[in-house]
């Protein structure tokens, strides 16, 4: 019998802040399970979840507007600790009898708050002291409205010159509100405050650890599928790789992985996937060479969105054909992770500000009545990587830069041809190899090469030649929503350019992309 790692749990009600998933990740980092729900949950749902504590997130709305989101009244009657962050503090103050007003000046960025009264939330936590010995905290503010009167049974814990109620508390009820964002690294003691709330005030044990998550997932897979056979589309990406390793540990040879080589992978990637998962780890893998099929389907197509759809459609066709060849397969495994679940829920309710379409395998033939196994659906990406390490997958594979689902299909601009893919693969491999040699790979968030379908004149020996152009792209980002182009050293870029032009016959010019996001996107297509 495995330990119940969901025994202690935090409920986070989402009011729409861009930082809400970060709050959840911080709670998970403290070893405590949490879930992220839309703000308008019912009393029955909260009772059923049975949280040890509730966090009210920030949000873009104004509590001074009549129809702005409010926490369900039951939240304040459930008898559990509450932590309101920014908008979450404002709605708590307003709903419990305080007052909120639009501020004349929007407070955004660094601020220093002075602790004026003792509170369990910040006791012994400080960044500096005032001349008369009062604790100071360096925090990150992002708000327009502010609380101008706190509920009568609350006390002021901390304030700034422009924000008289930066922290408020009702110690008896264990209700706390902060006007800043403790989840961001700019709030230097933010993690300690979250730890104080989750571990001390809510009294949650650190049960959510990689080893225990693996034990729990293995037990749940075995309980769900029993002795049945399971099929998984293995791409070699992080999510499908960790899913494969978890299933292999749980059910061994009853798992069949289908690896579709679409001809759009990185240099030697197919061989590496087959060697690692087949030869090294001993998984049962069906290798499907399908390069010709994908490239013929893409022939003549220049539109990026159309290319994506073609690649997705052909993958499903190939996967379905292989699945039908297997006997007695009852379950389809997918590497769905928690952000996918959150996005799907947001899409269904229409509450998300930005929704991207998410595609897993999907589209299986109607005659295949399969159940769905999603062992990663409670996990964030950083948790998936930690579990992968625990399962023995190599660090370099788990922490390599993101690679688009359509692969080189969207890194070859315009029509995709085998010649272009082969040139791009070799050029990109040189760029990545040089980044690693210069100890720059882990200093940038994503780096890759793009094939441009234009010829440029070059000089080779005594002759002139017209060959293709590639662009190097490297960015630095925290969340991939915005990004800066990476200021790589000139001598490094020169070395990469020389190697590509000299070693990859067919490329005569290398350029470097210095566009930020916005206005550009990270990928070219």
Swiss-Prot record:
Binding-site list for ATP: 235-241
Domain GMPS ATP-PPase: 208-400
The enzyme's E.C. designation: 6.3.5.2
Superkingdom of this protein's organism: Bacteria
Catalysed reaction equations from the record: XMP + L-glutamine + ATP + H2O = GMP + L-glutamate + AMP + diphosphate + 2 H(+)
Purpose: Catalyzes the synthesis of GMP from XMP.
Subunit: Homodimer.
Protein name: GMP synthase [glutamine-hydrolyzing]
């Amino acid at each position: 019998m495995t330990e119940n790692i969901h025994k202690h749990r935090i409920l986070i009600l989402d009011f729409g802040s861009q930082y809400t998933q970060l709050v959840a990740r911080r709670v998970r980092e403290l070893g405590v399970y949490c879930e992220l729900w839309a703000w308008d949950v019912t009393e029955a749902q909260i009772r059923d979840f049975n949280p040890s504590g509730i966090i009210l997130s920030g949000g873009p709305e104004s509590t001074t507007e009549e129809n702005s989101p409010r926490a369900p009244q039951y939240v304040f009657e459930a008898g559990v600790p509450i932590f309101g962050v920014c908008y979450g503090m404002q709605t708590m103050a307003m709903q419990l009898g305080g007052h909120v007003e639009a501020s004349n000046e929007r407070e955004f960025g660094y601020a220093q708050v002075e602790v004026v009264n003792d509170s369990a939330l910040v006791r012994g936590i400080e960044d500096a002291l005032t001349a008369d010995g009062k604790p100071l905290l360096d925090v990150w503010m992002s708000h327009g409205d502010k609380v101008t009167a706190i509920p009568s049974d609350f006390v002021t814990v901390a304030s700034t010159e422009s924000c008289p109620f930066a922290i408020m508390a009702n110690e008896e009820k264990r209700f706390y509100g902060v006007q800043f964002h403790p989840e961001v690294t700019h709030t230097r003691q933010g993690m300690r405050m979250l730890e104080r709330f989750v571990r001390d005030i809510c009294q949650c044990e650190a049960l959510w650890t990689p080893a225990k998550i693996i034990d729990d997932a293995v037990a749940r897979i075995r309980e769900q599928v029993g002795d049945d056979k399971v099929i998984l589309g293995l791409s070699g990406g992080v999510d499908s790789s960790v899913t494969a390793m978890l299933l292999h540990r749980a059910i061994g040879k009853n798992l069949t992985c289908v690896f579709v080589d679409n001809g759009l992978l990185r240099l030697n990637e197919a061989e590496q996937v087959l060697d690692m998962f087949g030869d090294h780890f001993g998984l049962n893998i069906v290798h499907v060479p399908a390069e010709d099929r994908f490239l013929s389907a893409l022939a003549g197509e220049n539109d990026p969105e159309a290319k994506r759809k073609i690649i997705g459609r052909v993958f499903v066709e190939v996967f379905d054909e292989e699945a039908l060849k297997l006997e007695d397969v009852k379950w389809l495994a997918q590497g769905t992770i928690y952000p996918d679940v959150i996005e799907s829920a947001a899409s269904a309710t229409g509450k998300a500000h930005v929704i991207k379409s998410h595609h897993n395998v999907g589209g299986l033939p109607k005659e295949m009545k399969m159940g769905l196994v999603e062992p990663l659906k409670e996990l964030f990406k950083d948790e998936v990587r930690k579990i992968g390490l625990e399962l023995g997958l190599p660090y370099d594979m788990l922490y390599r830069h993101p690679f688009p689902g359509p692969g080189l299909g969207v890194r070859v601009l315009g029509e995709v041809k085998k010649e272009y893919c082969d040139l791009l693969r070799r050029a990109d491999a040189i760029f990545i190899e040089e980044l690693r040699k210069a100890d720059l790979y882990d200093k940038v968030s994503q780096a890759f090469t793009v094939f441009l379908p234009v010829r440029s004149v070059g000089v080779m020996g005594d002759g002139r030649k017209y060959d293709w152009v590639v662009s190097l792209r490297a960015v630095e980002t925290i969340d991939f929503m915005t990004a800066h182009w990476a200021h790589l050293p000139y001598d490094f870029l020169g070395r990469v350019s020389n190697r590509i032009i000299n070693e990859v016959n067919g490329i005569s010019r290398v350029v470097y992309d210095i566009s930020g996001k916005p206005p550009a996107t990270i990928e070219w297509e």
